[in-house]
Amino acid sequence: MLLAENRAPFGSIYVSEKDFENSDSQAWFIATQIRYYLARITTAPFEVKANDDGNGIYISFDKDYADDEFSINTENGSLYITGGKRGVIYGGYELLEIIGCRFFTPDCEKIPTITKLEIDDINKREKPIFEFRDTDYGSVTHYLKFATQCRVNGRWNDVPEMLGGSIRYALGAHSFAWLVPHHEYRDTHPEYFSFYNGRRQNVENDHWQLCLTNPDLVDIVVKNAREILKANPDKKILSISQNDNPYNCQCENCLKSDAEEGSPVGTLIKFVNHVAEILEPEFPDVMFDILAYHYTRPASRKTQTRHNVCVRLCASSTCFAHPYDKCDDRSRAVKHPNGKTTVFIDDLIEWSKVCNRLYVWDYTSNFPLYPMPFANWRVLQPNLQTMAKHNVKGVFEEANCAANGGVDFNELRTYLLCKLMWNPDCDIDAYRKEFMEYYYGEAAPHLDKYLNMLCDFVEKGNYHLYIQDIKRPDYLSEELLITYNDLFDKAEKAVAGDGIRLSRVQKARLSIRFVDIFWNEILSGNYNAQKINQFFTDLRAHNISRLDEWSNIERTYRAWMEGKERGVYLSTPWRYDRESIL
C-alpha cells in the first residue's frame, strides 16, 4: 500500500466528526502524531480530516476493544487503526514502528527518511499479556508521551485522557500509615498497633504495623478508605498494605491466625476481604490491593482473596543474577510460621494457584548503590516469561526513580523492560541490538561486550545478586575493572567525533568510575578530593540527581566529604526532583 511518494501523500488521515471537534480525544492525538512523523519521514503534507469516503488512514476508538487493545488492517486501498482508549494510540505508534520509527528515549528517536513510502498489507490485532504495566524509571515517570510510546499504562503521575489515561492507585503501597494514622491513635488506642518485642509499638518509630485481629480497625479503615476513594474517583485500585518493615504483630490472636493460615498474609487477607466486602456496593469498580511482601510473601493455605482483592507479590530477597526458576540460592528464603522456608519462585507458583488477580512487584536496580553495574540483563526476559506462565496479570518494575535517570545503562533497560511487559516473548535480542547500534553508534560493540562480560562472570561463578547489597561483588574486582576501562576507552575512541554519542558513552562510564571511587576511596578512607570533585562535576553535567534511593547527590557529596559512605546518613525525606513533562 502506497502512503506517500515524491513529497505527495496518497490520502488524508481521518477521524470521526466527534474526534475532529475534540482536540483532547485519543484519536485526534494519535492522528496528529502520525501526521507529524509521516511528514518527517516523507516531507509529505498529510492532513487530518473528519471521516469521508476517500482513501487514507482511518483512526477510530471502539468501546468493544479492551482499553489497551488495537487492530491495524489494510483494506480496499485504506488503512484502519482501531482500538480502546489507549489501544488506539498504541496502534498508531505500532504503525510508525512498522514503517521503521523507533522511540528509544524521550530525546532519542530513530526516524527514517523515505521518498516512496509503501507498506505491506497488515492484518493484526494485539493486546498485552499484562493488564497493568509500570516502571518508575525517570524517563517514563516524567515524560508522559514517551511512557505512552512505551505502552506503560500504570502511572504514579496524572496522565491526561488525551494520552489514554492510566491505571492509578489511590494509595500505592505501605498504606497503613494513611488508613490508621499512628499519631492519631497511638496514645488513646495502643492496642491498634502491633505487639512486638514485648510491647505495643505505639511509640514514635518506624517499627509499627497494625494488629489486624483487632475488630475496631475494620471500621476505621473503611471510613478512611471511603474518604480517599471519594476524593479520587478516577483511581480504581486502593492498597491496604503493611508498612515497610518486618515487625508484624505477635499478639496471641494474630499469631494464632497466622499459624492457622500458614502465613501472616492470611490474617491480612481476612482483614482486607472484610473491608472490600463492605465497600464494594459503593465502589463496585475498585480493586483492593495487598502486598505479599517479606513476612506476607508466602501464600495463605486457608483464606483466599475475594474477587475484588488483588495481590501484589514482591520479588524482594530474590536473586537477580539468575532467572527465578533457575537460581539455587535459598539463603534469603522467607520463613513460614511452621518453620518451612520458600524462595520467590515457590511463592509465585503457590499464589498462581489460589489468586485470580496476581500482580508482581519486580526490581531492577541496586537501591543503595544506583550507579553500580547491576548484571541482571539475562534475567529480564525469562523472569517476565515466568510471570506470564503463572498467570500474573500486572507488573511493576521498580527502578532508579531519579528524574534524570542513572548511569547503569538505564535508558536501555527501560526500553527493553517496556517491550517485555507488552510481550514477554518478543525478540529482545533484536530490540537490544537496534538500541545499542543507534544510541551508541560505533561504540556499541565495545559496550555490548562489557555488558556480556558482566553477565558471563556472574553466571560462570554462580554469583548471586541482590537489590540491597553494599558489599563489592566479584564481577567488579580490580582486575576486571582494568578490562572494563579498556573497553570504555575503545568505546570513547570509536565515537570521538560524535559529540552526542560520546557524551552517552561517558555517562555510562560513570558507573565504573563510581565503583572505583566508592570502594577504593570512600570505604577505604583514602580520599582523593580532586578525583571525587571531578566525579561529582561530571554527574552534574549529565543531570544525575541520585546515587541511591534515599538521597540526592548533593547530600551524598556532603556525606562523602564528611567520611560517611552514603547520603542517607544525613538524610531528610526525599522527593521527586521535578514535575512531569508531557
Where are these regions (language model features)?
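Loop/turn elements at helix/coil->beta-strand transitions in domains of secreted/extracellular proteins
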Residues: 54, 233-236, 283-288, 307-309, ...
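Substrate-binding cleft/loops of secretory-pathway carbohydrate-active enzymes
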Residues: 288-320, 371-379, 404-414
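Catalytic domains of carbohydrate-active enzymes that cleave complex glycans
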Residues: 417-582
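Conserved radical SAM core fold
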Residues: 207, 245-247, 314-333, 365-367
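Structured mid-domain segments that build the active-site/substrate or prosthetic-cofactor binding neighborhood
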Residues: 213-219, 227, 332-443, 449
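Feature activates predominantly on carbohydrate-active enzymes
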Residues: 6-12, 18-21, 25-33, 37-41, ...
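Acidic, His- and aromatic-enriched active-site or binding-groove loops in soluble protein domains
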Residues: 258-275, 305-325, 387, 416-426
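Short, well-ordered secondary-structure micro-motifs within conserved domains or adaptor modules
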Residues: 46-68, 74, 80
